[in-house]
A protein has these predicted regions:
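Periplasmic/ER-lumenal interhelical loops and adjacent helix-loop junctions
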Residues: 1-53, 60-61, 67-75, 84-89, ...
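Contiguous transmembrane helix-bundle modules in multi-pass membrane proteins
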Residues: 55-65, 69, 78-166
Length: 166
């Protein structure tokens, strides 16, 4: 099929919904989730017993989107016609659950976590733009997503350094 890094470009903002037969999944869940998933991994208040299964699920879903046999099984032993990656809603749900856990345990996030999370999300977008298919994920979609990631990173840093009210 295609590379996992290339398919992450489908998580870019303003990416058009794909309905072709090349099986590119529609993975957009918001640019904020791209930062939150890294903050989830770095957050010390979230136990590894919770992190490992969720991260393994994300990896399994990404591999399922990119592997022909797993995608065939996910689609009920049929090749999809014009609706690829039907299980992408499960991937997005796991991302959102991880994002919610990150926000819920916000006190476990440090300033350097935010910087690393933003840099990691930006790196993933750069790699997906470089290795992705420009016909499926436009260059401007990757650039706009990177701008959103930077804005979210700045806002999160401002939130972290804001004086605490008693």
């Amino acid at each position: 099929y295609f590379s996992v890094i290339g398919e992450l470009g489908r998580a870019a903002a303003v990416t058009t919904s794909y309905t072709g037969n090349d099986h590119w999944p529609n993975l957009y869940a918001g640019a904020f989730t791209l930062v939150l998933v890294w903050l989830y991994v770095l957050n010390r208040r979230i136990s590894w017993k919770e992190k490992v299964p969720r991260m393994l699920m994300l990896v399994f879903f990404l591999v399922s989107f990119a592997d022909n046999q797993l995608d065939y099984i996910w689609h009920g032993m049929h090749f999809p016609q014009a609706l690829p990656g039907r299980q992408s809603f499960l991937y997005i749900f796991v991302l959102l659950v991880m994002g919610f856990a990150t926000i819920r345990k916000w006190k476990g996030t440090r300033r350097w976590h935010i910087i690393i999370a933003v840099l990691a999300a930006l790196t993933l977008m750069v790699l997906s733009g470089y290795y992705g298919d420009e016909l499926v994920t436009e260059y401007m979609a990757v650039v706009i997503t990177m701008l959103f990631i930077l804005v979210y990173g700045i806002l999160l840093l401002l939130l972290k350094i804001a004086p605490k009210k008693m």
